[in-house]
């Protein structure tokens, strides 16, 4: 039987994993990747915030230890030429170095030489050098605009050059101690404390609010904020007008609506505005809530008239002036004043009259004619015409119209203007008043005891004889105060809301003392108020007290009836 040759056992390659258990201590671990090393270093720096930088002594100590470790490594592994040596460095990343070859740092790379091998007999000493870190190059480009008055030219003295430019590209000081231009193209200060040019080459504001000369011979803004020709307000820089009509400072076209945004109102120079109320500059202003504004910027609203009267189409001719008529006029004036006092002046906005105001004119003319007829007749008793019939002859009353009224609190009311008898309903449902017999005996034949009467415009009954009474009679209600006020207010729309809310009667609970219970007693009993035993007559506890106070008929407490006698002796 043939024996097979024993298989040669392959030599296990030494494990160089850093955390492997089978790795011998003599074998150095594999180097970690550069990116992973930098991440670990970053984590380590984040964990140790206090010690961020290593001192010089620690660096020297680490370098000495690395040199000693490298020397020992070459002494131990000199017999094995194929073994790769690893040189630690300060950065914590070890780079592989072949024996007898130049170091990777000297070649500029981190990988061993491909032809490394048995080139040399004695290893050369490799110095530990820090690995090159990546460099981030940040380039900042500053674009310097050209100065507004020429490169190197002085603003005050054109033609004279400035001195040598300053460091880092900044302009140096001007000649004779004058300040140079500002940094990065901005204009500097002017000479002798005067301000320099403004932005974009326009003149700045002078000292003590005096104007500075504008560029190219144009005048600058005036002093104290008043605009000079071509200037503007204080604190603002107005560019001068261009050479041509309709162009701006740089030859740009002006906007078409530029006149709308002008500072002053050109209409104030017209003759139509001379008689108006102007301010100290002669410029009309609109006043609104204590502040004023320009008239062309604020739409002026008409002034609110509190008691406006709607225009009447037909005005009755005034009656003949008599003494009684003057008295009636005085009475009507007094009534109007009282009604205005009732309505309240100064409350509410303007009224908007809708529809014709025939009703108010008819009622006023009707009242005047009735007064004249009463005055013309003998005595105070007159026969006024029927109101409904009179209105039917003159024309049907206008339709009901609504007028919206807003008071000072912006609360809106709708006042409905209607004819009389609004409180009782229609006119034919009103009850007519009866007249008493006439005191004059001469007029007994012509006077009817069953004579009826109507109410005049003042709400008073006026007796009418039977013969003179109209055949078709429609009764008219007695005017209440509300109806008189409404009649006087028609067509004036400033009304008062007479509708009052009904007050709900508040039901008052009967007073009873608050009851406190002893909830922990069994059964719970009342603590306050204490229950009283109305025990009238002789008390059963009189004899032991020998005190007549307990024998009186009074309310006693069931709990303290034994102690109702103060200071009484007991057996």
Curated annotation (Swiss-Prot):
Q: Where are the compositionally biased (Low complexity) regions?
A: 205-215, 311-326
- For the region Disordered, give the residue spans: 71-128, 142-258, 298-336
For bias type Pro residues, the affected ranges are 168-184
Q: Where is the composition biased (Gly residues)?
A: 217-234
Residue ranges annotated as compositionally biased, kind Polar residues, are 88-113
In Swiss-Prot or TrEMBL terms, this protein is called Uncharacterized protein CG42266
């Amino acid at each position: 039987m043939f024996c097979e040759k024993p298989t040669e056992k392959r030599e296990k390659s030494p494990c160089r994993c850093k955390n492997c258990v089978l790795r011998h201590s003599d074998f150095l671990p594999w180097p970690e990747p550069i990116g992973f090393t930098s991440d670990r270093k970053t984590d380590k720096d984040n964990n140790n915030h206090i010690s961020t930088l290593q001192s010089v002594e620690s660096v020297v100590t680490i370098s000495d230890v690395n040199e000693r470790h490298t020397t020992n490594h070459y002494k131990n592994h000199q017999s094995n030429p194929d073994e790769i040596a690893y040189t630690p460095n300060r950065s914590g990343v070890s780079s592989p170095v072949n024996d007898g070859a130049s170091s990777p740092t000297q070649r500029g790379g981190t990988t061993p030489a491909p032809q490394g091998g048995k080139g040399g007999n004695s290893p050369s000493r490799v110095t530990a050098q820090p690995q090159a870190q990546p460099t981030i190059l940040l380039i900042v480009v500053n674009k310097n605009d050209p100065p507004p008055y020429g490169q190197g030219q002085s603003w005050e003295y054109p033609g004279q050059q400035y001195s040598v430019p300053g460091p880092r590209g900044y302009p140096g000081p001007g000649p004779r101690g004058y300040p140079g231009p500002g940094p990065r193209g901005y204009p500097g200060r002017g000479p002798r404390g005067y301000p320099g040019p403004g932005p974009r080459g326009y003149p700045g504001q002078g000292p003590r609010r005096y104007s500075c000369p504008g560029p190219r011979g144009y005048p600058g803004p005036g002093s104290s904020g008043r605009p000079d020709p071509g200037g503007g307000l204080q604190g603002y820089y107005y560019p001068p007008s261009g050479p041509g009509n309709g162009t701006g400072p740089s030859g740009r076209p002006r906007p078409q609506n530029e006149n709308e945004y002008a500072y002053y109102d050109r209409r104030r120079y017209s003759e139509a505005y001379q008689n108006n109320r102007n301010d100290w500059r002669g410029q009309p202003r609109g006043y609104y809530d204590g502040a004023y504004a320009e008239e062309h910027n604020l739409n002026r609203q008409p002034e609110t008239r509190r008691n406006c009267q709607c225009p009447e189409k037909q005005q009755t001719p005034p009656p003949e002036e008599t003494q009684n008529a003057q008295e009636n006029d005085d009475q009507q004036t007094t009534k109007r004043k009282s009604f205005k006092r009732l309505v309240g002046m100064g409350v509410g906005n303007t009224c908007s009259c809708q529809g014709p105001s025939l009703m108010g004119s008819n009622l006023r003319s009707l009242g005047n004619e009735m007064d004249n007829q009463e005055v013309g007749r003998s005595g105070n008793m007159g026969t006024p015409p029927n109101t409904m019939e009179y209105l039917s002859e003159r024309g049907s009353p206008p339709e009901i119209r609504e007028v919206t009224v807003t008071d000072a609190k912006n609360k809106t009311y709708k006042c409905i203007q209607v004819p009389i008898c609004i409180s009782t309903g229609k006119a034919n449902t009103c009850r007519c008043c009866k007249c008493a017999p006439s005191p004059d005996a001469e007029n007994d034949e012509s006077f009817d005891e069953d004579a009826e009467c109507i109410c005049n415009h003042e709400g008073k009954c006026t007796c009418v004889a039977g013969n003179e009474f109209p055949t078709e009679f429609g009764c008219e209600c007695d005017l209440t105060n509300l109806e008189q006020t409404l009649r006087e207010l028609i067509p004036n729309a400033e009304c008062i809301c007479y509708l009052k809310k009904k007050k709900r009667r508040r039901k008052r609970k009967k007073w009873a003392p608050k009851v406190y219970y002893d909830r922990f007693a069994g059964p719970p009993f009342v603590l306050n108020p204490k229950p009283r035993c109305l025990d009238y007559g002789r008390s059963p506890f009189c004899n032991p007290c020998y005190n007549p106070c307990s024998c009186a008929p009074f309310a006693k407490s069931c709990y303290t009836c034994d102690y109702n006698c103060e200071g009484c002796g007991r057996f």
